[in-house]
Amino acid sequence: MKPVVCFYFLCVRAVWIPLRSTPTLRNDSADAFPGWAAAPIPTGLAPIAPSEREARFAAGFPGKIGVFSDGARIYVVRWVRTSTRKLHPASDCLLALGYSVKPLPIFASTDGSHWGTSSVQHGTERLRVRERIVDLGGREWTDVSAWFWSAALGHNAGPWWAVTIFEPPEPPAGVKAPL
């Protein structure tokens, strides 16, 4: 019976260790928000005011959240100062809102960045959703879970930029695909 007790103790311990609140690495600049101009998004986007519900969510988020548009796309930009479960894939929210979500292959942009991509639909509305997380050193994640465990285990120190783009399935005629 003792080996079983020891095994369970080690399992509980293994789960608890990565969930401790302080990551191994710490970046002292993590609390200094650099402003939206530093975000890895195109310049000249128009800010969109958050809804009341979005503002309530942002109040408990460990960082800053901004929403912007270029007229054809919506950019949800999150500056994240610490690992958190409050950063989750767009598909989680979209599924909760009744959208169907179909994962697509990783999108490689002309600038060399990589994006997790999905096709989503709700009734007749269809969108392509792209998302990525990038740290100040240029390391990127296309999967929120991979980012979380990397951050929670202290493999990198924040802050990070998380960018989600909601766009038509095909860019409108005459509109260049961003990033």
Residue ranges of each PLM-predicted region?
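Alpha-helical transmembrane signal-anchor/signal-peptide segments
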Residues: 21-41
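Surface-exposed amphipathic alpha-helical segments
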Residues: 159-179
